Amino acid sequence: LSSAASDVYKRQGTGSVSVEMALQCGSGRVYAVDRNPEAVSLTDKNKHIFKCDNIEIIGGNAMDNIEKLPVPDRVFIGGSGGELQQIIKMVFKKNRKAVIVVTAVSLETLNKSLEGFRICGAETEIVQVSITRTKSVGEYTMLCGENPVFIIKGTIL
């Protein structure tokens, strides 16, 4: 997600992406929505550690809060509580020009995001990233792969 000073963000998670976006967008606002009270607390802690006064943290379900938030320019979805397609539809309903980025660690979430973008007429770009660690096994160094993460970007042209 590239950012500009006027961009508005909506985010679900534990704070790392919210903080990064807040630092990038300068005078823009970041709205961090999470239904997990522990994640809300961690996001608030990181907001203060990194001096990000432009983050507004909202506890609760994304679907219950999207309508109340300003029209977003960029949206990051790191978890959806099973409502991924509905969230995608709702964001594009508010702003057809929004850029939505979803992270997925399962094929089912990848599929649901692609289907949600397809239903809305959005173009998609997918990047898959994975981490590989090494482990010493005798005189050999073995590569041990971690779970891959899919990053799906949806835009309506």
Task: List PLM regions with ranges.
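Single conserved hydrophobic/aromatic residue that forms the stacking wall/gate
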Residues: 1-5, 9
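Conserved Rossmann-like nucleotide-cofactor binding loop
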Residues: 13, 38, 108
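Conserved SAM-binding loop of SAM-dependent methyltransferases across substrates and taxa
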Residues: 14-26
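Conserved SAM-binding motif I beta-strand of class I
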Residues: 29-34
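S-adenosyl-L-methionine
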Residues: 35-69
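Short SAM/SAH-binding signature in class I
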Residues: 71-79
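C-terminal substrate-binding/active-site "lid" region of AdoMet-derived donor-dependent transferases
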Residues: 92-145
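Core SAM-dependent methyltransferase catalytic element
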Residues: 140-157
